[in-house]
Amino acid sequence: MEIINNSQKYDVIIVGSGAGGGMATKVLSDAGLKIALIEAGPYFDPANPDQMTQMKWPWESPRRGSGTTRAFGDFHMSYGDWKVEGEPYTIEKETSFRWWRSRMLGGRTNHWGRISLRFGPKDFKSKDYDGLGENWPISYDDIKPYYNKLDKLIGVFGTKENIFNEPDGFFLPPPKPRLHELFYIKGARKSGVTVIPSRLSILTKRINNTRGVCFYCGQCDRSCSAYADF
């Protein structure tokens, strides 16, 4: 094994470019620090024609649409698996724990449903409400300013509903309900069930000049070439 000396000097070295490492990189670099970001997987850009799988037909896959053992199919844009060779994590015998291991720029931010809900006051102090578990040493009010910053940074659509344990945030307009959803909403409200739009980190309007807006292709799992999802 060859060890290559690098003359560059950095203030911080961050291992992993996923949700934690990526956000730490942004915050520290915005503060003026020089960052070295180390990632086990390859560079990835969902708008790169050589990597993009969005809006492609099954016969355009490497296997021309035939079956694959790759988790979630050939067009799923998250390089990794439930188990990765060399992974150091272990579990007890006769137990099961499935956790997606993503090896690429962005890590598991390329593999999630973009559901962006806040923990509410009850979630931080559950023992006070049901006697189970332990309370967090912090409250929702302690975390609220950071939720607010994140909403504005990544863009989350939703509606303000004033539900105590589903705190409102800074929302973009939600998509209009489709016909079958209108039927669900009508039936639920007739039964006295509260129905609200989901809260997802998908842009329904522009928040900056580097990311586009969702065009409703329904292929978020293929990664967005318009950069409309986070």
Where are the regions a protein language model picked out?
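N-terminal Rossmann-like FAD-binding beta1-loop-alpha1 element of flavoenzymes
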Residues: 12-37
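Glycine-rich FAD pyrophosphate-binding loop
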Residues: 29-51
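Short, glycine-/Ser/Thr-/acidic-enriched flexible segments
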Residues: 20, 42-43, 110, 116-117
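Acidic, Ser/Thr-rich peripheral helices and adjacent loops at domain boundaries
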Residues: 50-64
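Conserved redox-cofactor binding core of oxidoreductases
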Residues: 61, 66-82, 89-98, 103, ...
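Extracellular/periplasmic catalytic domains that process cell-envelope and extracellular macromolecules
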Residues: 6, 103-104
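A short, basic/flexible loop-to-alpha-helix module at the beginning of a structural domain
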Residues: 1-9
